[in-house]
Swiss-Prot record:
Family: Belongs to the KAE1 / TsaD family.
Lineage: Bacteria, Bacillati, Mycoplasmatota, Mycoplasmoidales, Metamycoplasmataceae
InterPro entries listed in its UniProt record: ATPase_NBD, Gcp-like_dom, KAE1/TsaD, TsaD
Name the UniProt record assigns to this protein: tRNA N6-adenosine threonylcarbamoyltransferase
Binding residue positions for Fe cation: H108, H112, D294
Residues annotated for substrate binding in this entry: L130, V131, S132, G133, G134, D163, G176, D180, N270
Pfam families: TsaD (PF00814)
Gene name, Swiss-Prot/TrEMBL: tsaD
Enzyme class per UniProt: transferase
Amino acid sequence: MIIFAIESSHDDTSFALLDDNKPIWMKTITQTEIHKQYGGTVPEIASRLHVKNIGILIEDIKSQININKIDLIAYTKEPGLVGSLHVGYVVAQSLALILNKKIVGLNHLEGHFYSAFIGKEVIYPALGLLVSGGHSQLVLYNSKDDFKIIGQTQDDAVGEVYDKVARKLNLGFPGGPLIDQIWKNNHKLYTAHLTIPKTEGFFDFSFSGIKTNVINLINNCASRNEQINVNQIATEFQNTIVEYLKEHMETAIKKFSPKCIVLAGGVSANFAIREMFYSLHKNVFLPDLEYTTDNAMMIARLAYEKFRYNN
């Protein structure tokens, strides 16, 4: 079964082909450099660029496969930027009508979970940690159709906090890779972490308090005319994030006894978080780095998981 997938929920335009869980081809056009000058994604600009980039990708895919051989067309239906999602939907719907193929709209967040299983089989029950710029969730998967969000952020997403802290430290955008690189160079020197937040929900997150702690540290240094130690603040910020996620995962593993644990989402590319994750369980699934950010292959993999049992 050959699945063609489209991902356009945010600022990446991505096409992919998957044949029975074997990746055939993927191409993603990112808009990061364009949005960097604005300090974040501008929805209207993102939509316009999706229209332009999809035209390029359509020409590319025609050179990869006889499109009549496609069995299923999948696209990201939700969540995401409304305009960006609509561009992907229109293209998917048009191709489905032209080729007379089945079409399925899928959830972007579910796709991230299955990004760790591209070319692999899922082991249920699985405990997934989704960490990205827009979402932070703990999800327990008992099967492809039986899953429950057992915890989620009550305020900022973890990737969002990385961007805000990086901006306050004048590091640039996106903040995650920049802070992670500082951590790699300094974590043996700076081992402390900030206060770990507490939430009413046992498995919920609250990242805004960590962000506020960092901002207060910076503002206090500035008010005293002290030099801001960017390396120390960035490193101890990441130490805090890693410890916070680790505490939640350890508690959830003890309570639910999953057969495997899964890390997914854009922040899953973070070196420190990946290293921590491997220490938690004997069966650990992480996406390859090319599949950590938004991509169509994860949507194709989700479609394969859903559709192969319902054919």
